[in-house]
Structure formats: C-alpha cells, structure tokens
C-alpha cells in the first residue's frame, strides 16, 4: 500500500495583520510538512464577513511569502463555500441529529447555566426535546445544534500528549449553524480539512478542545481523522496571550525593523528548535525539524527580543 501523502494547512483569519502567535503556528505547521516532503494548503477562514476582507487576505499571502513559508495550493475561502456546507448540514439532518435551538446568548451565559472550571458553558440541552407545538411559540429564527453522544473522545496530540473529552458533559450539543444562517467554525473546518485531504492539523494550544468536537463531526461525515499538534501559546511578558491588539508584535510593525531570518531564528530558538538565537531562513530548519525538540510550555516574548 502506498504511503499516505502528508498534507498540512495554513488557515488564517483575514481580519488584521498576522501577529507572532500566528507566525509561530504557521512556521511549525510548515516545518512539519516540509520535513516530510508534504503539501501545504492555504485556506482563508473568513466565515465572519463583517470582520474579514480580501485586502487582509492579500496581505496575509504577502506576509507568508516574506517569511519564506510557501504553500502549494489555495482552496476557496470559507465565505464562498456555503453551498458545500449546506450539503453536509443536510446529511446531518437526514441522520436525525440536528434540532433547532432558540436559546439566547444571555440564557446560555447566565450564572445559572452549567459551566466548566475555565468559565465556558456546557449546553444543558434546553431545546433538545422540544415538541413542534413548543417550537411554534418562538417567533425568531433558531440556531441549529447537532446531538452529541455520551462518549469519551481521545486525542494523542503530538505536543500536548494524551487529551480526552466527553462531549456530552464537557461541551453539550454543538451549534453547527447560527440563527443568521452562518455556519460555525467546527463544521466549516471539519469539512474544509476533510475535502482538502489534510492529514495533520497544527495550531495553537487554545484550540485543543476543538479536536474532539471535530473528530466527532469527521466520524459522522465520513472523513478520516488527521493527526493533531497544538503548539504552545506565545505570551507577552505580563502573561497575556499575544493577539492582533499587540500592534508592536504584528508583522505590519515587525517587517519595518527585522528581517524574516531574524524573526524565524528568534521563534525557533524560543521554541527549542535551535541552540542559539541567530538569523536563519525557514528552509534551513526543515531538514532538522523534529517534534520532540519543541517546547510544550508557553513561550514568553517581547519586542526587544526581536530587535
């Protein structure tokens, strides 16, 4: 049997300039794929069309080229794939797994709603078994949820190790389409990765809890499970997660004062991939990349380290 080709992906949201956390995840994803002679796919995750734009998408492409992180093909953006998601939504509906949910945001986040220790809410199934007569009393468009089983899902993550989640108790039935008709991240990403033939998903540790949710949808929609690697978060010195609000650490600012080689070198050194903080092009790291070198804990960075 022929060995399965490695396919990875960049999946940025074109809502602003890339920040260092985006660059770090993209770098590790790229190194993993290129170290195996695999294929990189670019996909713009622009479900929220109010916050995203083609202008930022083009800037993201230019930033990736500047960094030396090439890709082999670009798939259509999520905003152009509603008809595709419709087909998979219909498949879930035909399986009898979808139901309309009329809960408001305030109801879901009320102090009386079930919450996990990190503050996220667990959907209690309020609308799961409503009768048609009860549904008729609501005079607003519903969101749509997929029923989840009382079952433990396990992820053997390349970075975080063993992780498990019972969707029924740790998540509850998941929204797959919002009341305004927009498909949500979990369904769109599952379909996009599945149709693109993605074999490994590399992204930030903050998305680890998404893996079991997507594995469940993959099983329902007949997609194979990819391998998962959730890389450490990049944090500011005060412990905040770097975001697009940290303007001094986004590529719009950094490109004016550092070279791509120095930026790649600092990230690789901070992650434990090289022994000295020195400029290095991404292509020189690919041949030596190994997952067991990568740090597991969060990485603290400030702008002075990049001068």
Language-model segments: what does each one mean?
Residues 72-74, 225-228, 274-280:
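Short, surface-exposed acidic
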Residues 48-58, 236-238, 286-296:
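Short, mixed-charge aromatic SLiMs
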Residues 1-15, 35, 40, 135-137, ...:
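Non-catalytic terminal extensions that flank enzyme cores
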Residues 57, 82, 105-108, 120, ...:
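Alpha-helix initiation and N-capping motif
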Residues 93-105, 151-155, 159-164, 278-297:
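A short, terminal or domain-edge coil/loop segment
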Residues 70, 98-99, 117, 260, ...:
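A general structural signal for well-ordered secondary-structure junctions
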Residues 106-243, 250-254, 303-307:
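Active-site cores that bind ATP or allylic diphosphates and position pyrophosphate for catalysis
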Residues 2-116, 205-206, 210-223:
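N-terminal Rossmann-like or analogous alpha/beta NTP/dinucleotide-binding catalytic cores
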